[in-house]
Amino acid sequence: MIRKAFVMQVNADAHEEYQRRHNPIWPELESVLKAHGAHHYAIYLDKERNLLFATVEIESEERWNAIASTDVCQRWWKHMRDVMPANPDNSPVSAELKEVFYLA
């Protein structure tokens, strides 16, 4: 399993809306994530800085990256772009984080 972590931003006035849209997440998006080998996906909110910290375990980078081209992912990005900064393709602006410590 490959552990990944990344950080995103959420608009200051959209914390509750961001959480509402994820609870529950669309069943078809959950299915696509699982079918592409995503496990233990969690997102945490830092309210003070409007930051989202996400962690996920994946089976392969190729399968993880393929999620972006699915119809449901494209629709999800459009659904979320009004509550967080987005790239021109509607994907959330994000930065991958380097793991510097892990205790199993």
From Swiss-Prot:
GO molecular function, one term: L-rhamnose mutarotase activity
Annotated metabolic or biological route of this protein: Carbohydrate metabolism; L-rhamnose metabolism
Assembly and binders: Homodimer.
Active site feature: H22
EC number assigned by the record: 5.1.3.32
Enzyme class: isomerase
Entry keyword Cytoplasm: yes
BP-aspect Gene Ontology terms: rhamnose catabolic process
Primary location recorded for the protein, binned into one broad class: cytoplasm
Binding site for substrate: Y18, Y41, W76, W77
Record function comment: Involved in the anomeric conversion of L-rhamnose.
Sequence similarity: Belongs to the rhamnose mutarotase family.
Protein name in the entry: L-rhamnose mutarotase
Biological source species: Citrobacter koseri (strain ATCC BAA-895 / CDC 4225-83 / SGSC4696)
